[in-house]
């Protein structure tokens, strides 16, 4: 069958610019993406040049994406559009820039990409290289373009090459034998010939198939001997960097290499897997070392960054232990796992959610389609190689309860807390291995889906973060605590702030810090349930409570306890007396007092009411708990050079020692709209609108006020209840008016 260089409609077919190669491939089709697998860019150039010149000679629009470090493939001034891009802006931004240029170029455009292998080097990730191709290739195909890509042979993992092979229309292996160049088509969609998949030698303008077995074996055996071994071919860019780091660390410790080499690799790995936020980079460079980063990798699933929550937890622990070695004994050992941010993007790409993700970068349409994308995320599947790593992690934890926590790139950084915007879910981790895996996968999906919630998207929009890379990593932590009957929970948990903004007495020192303390899981301290109380503890005056009155202990004490119900395999809230009834081994007197003892006055003999009241009195006065927390918060504040916000649990061991589990640390966020300031010393009387004396609950802030709205209380009270909501709506409309300058 002769090759015909026209389509069925009689129009001229696309071409590689090499008629002999067109004949081998049975011609190009609109939408073809051609990937050249080469040993070096010098083997890519002989195919790019004729493609470029043929396209321009035909009057085709030709676009060249220039982003790699190798020599330029398409020179300026010949009629091609050249887009110079930097992969260092991150996967999401880089991909958005490429797609925008493709959209603007329209249908039937011809493209040349620099070698894709440089993207893996800049992103430290073969996984993201595969993701880039999987979201870009179909887009080009739909627009009936013809596109050249290149990939360096034996530089990428099987998973990455497999993703590219499965997506492209044409994959060609290019190699040299002696002085001659060979092409070996490995995949050609919708075309076939008896000799298409043989190696072809290029000579005299034509490509001739090697069909004789003796010649084939001679050429291919020599080629195989020159290549790296099979084990090395399975390693991606990430693995190679980590192996190099481990080798350098060992040789530095042996005195074979200078310490400067370890420092340089540490800096690269820090940006590769921990953080690229400059303030956190500076902090991490001071408190972490290369061995810390290698330890992180051992407990990491996938590649990418570990996210803000993980960084805060690891940094805080390192700061404490290196400032005062006694904290190594005070802290509960953590054995957390980290799901890298690249897994999030991979999940979105492979479940068809990338288009919705891309649309979120538009400030006008970022909410459009978010709910549909969220539903798709909740029903998506994980790639097999990721699931296998999840299974191995769950085998490690056994049936110990775990918590799956959001740890996005921007979360818990300086200036962006994302408090409560992303989900974190407990997994009681009971049942068969398959049931536990299913529950864990559902939790990961829920965390990923929370990135598409309207609350999270509006928060990002309000803070100007819509066009920023916001990848979701995940922190998987063992839940701190112990089994008590059919329940699992820690003895105490809480939120600790190094600066106390709630000064309810002139005896309170704000710099001493404050703790919001609960019995059981810390969810009640973090979420502050409306139907219950937490214990507020000023760390310089722990017994001075904000509540007033003689009965302040029983009346304002915590009544319900958040626990994991192992028999029901779920999170639960139980009454304090019910929890105590199944927990006989607890050091109960540290946390609670009998209600009868508290209600009975001096000299009274009649029985008081039954049950227990959580007072924490002995914990606060007879143990080292308060001074330990005050020291912890002070050390972290000084290291951050900024107030900090922490989450922790604590358990007393049978020998009386207290172990603190520091699960989170981040810069203390100030409520939007102002900064913490010292109040002015003197304000003219005629400039005062409102004045109050006494303690101020919360932080002083300095804000620009556009307008003051006054609602007459008598007139408001006279309104029917059903009409009062209209006043609130009117105030909202006024507040949304443009600022007056």
Where are these regions (language model features)?
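Glycine-rich P-loop/Walker A and Walker A-like loops and their local beta1-loop-alpha1 context
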Residues: 13-67
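Substrate-engagement module of ASCE P-loop NTPases
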Residues: 122-123, 128-155
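Phosphate-binding/switch region of NTP-binding enzymes
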Residues: 1, 151-207
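Conserved mixed alpha/beta core segments that line enzyme active sites in large multi-domain catalysts
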Residues: 275, 280-283, 287-326, 381-741
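Long, compositionally biased, glycine/small-hydrophobic-enriched stretches that function as flexible linkers
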Residues: 204-290, 299, 451, 507
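A conserved helix-loop-beta module that forms one wall/lid of the active-site cleft
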Residues: 293-358, 364-366, 371-384
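Charged, amphipathic alpha-helical linker segments immediately N-terminal to NTP-binding catalytic cores
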Residues: 1-8
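Conserved inter-motif catalytic segment of the P-loop NTP-binding fold
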Residues: 58-123
